[in-house]
Design a protein with these regions (language model features):
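Non-catalytic cap/lid and distal C-terminal segments of serine-dependent acyl enzymes
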Residues: 1-178
Length: 178
């Protein structure tokens, strides 16, 4: 298996172009990545494995840039995904464009989102808290069933995200009351 650099991951998992002071400019190809996933990969899996392919049984989840992509997928492809988990989503990449997508997304009833971040992530807790709170508020205005958490002592790491799995699964698996 070929290992990808962080820069390639930032390009593939960002639906938007963005500039990072540390790493430079990125032409986000996340829209193409998710289009491939929706139109090629998911149909292949549904044809070759015993799945429940309908929207009600199709969830997506990820952390960091994968969390950003999961949030993007829930909004952009809500006819495919009913639920998503976005652990430490990289909403800093393009908060304005993501907020615009939240505002114009065609959302089905019963859409569910779990979203969190750790209180010890990345060193800019105040900025992250404000961006996270703004995104949570915007999502809730659209009627998405949201569970959000700021994880005390949580860091931007696999070890921290692993501890959030019980909360994430509880949110994704419960019945939604309309």
């Amino acid at each position: 298996m070929q290992r990808r650099s962080n820069n390639e991951r930032l390009v593939e998992y960002s639906p938007y172009r963005f500039d990072d002071p540390q790493f430079g400019h990125f032409d986000g190809t996340g829209q193409a990545t998710m289009s491939w996933y929706i139109h090629r990969f998911k149909p292949f899996i549904d044809r070759n494995f015993r799945t429940l392919p309908d929207r009600e049984h199709t969830f997506i989840g990820g952390s960091s840039m994968g969390g950003l992509m999961s949030l993007y997928a829930l909004l952009q492809y809500n006819d495919t995904f009913s639920r998503a988990a976005a652990l430490s989503p990289s909403i800093w990449v393009s908060p304005e464009k993501l907020s615009g997508l939240v505002g114009r997304a065609k959302l089905e009833p019963g859409t569910v989102l779990y979203m969190d971040y750790g209180s010890r992530e990345m060193g800019n807790h105040d900025g992250m808290r404000c961006g996270f709170a703004e995104m949570c508020a915007k999502v809730m205005t659209r009627g998405i069933h949201l569970t959000s958490r700021i994880v005390p002592g949580g860091t931007h790491s696999e070890a921290s995200w692993e501890k959030q799995l019980p909360f994430m699964f509880h949110t994704l698996m419960y019945e939604v009351e309309e």
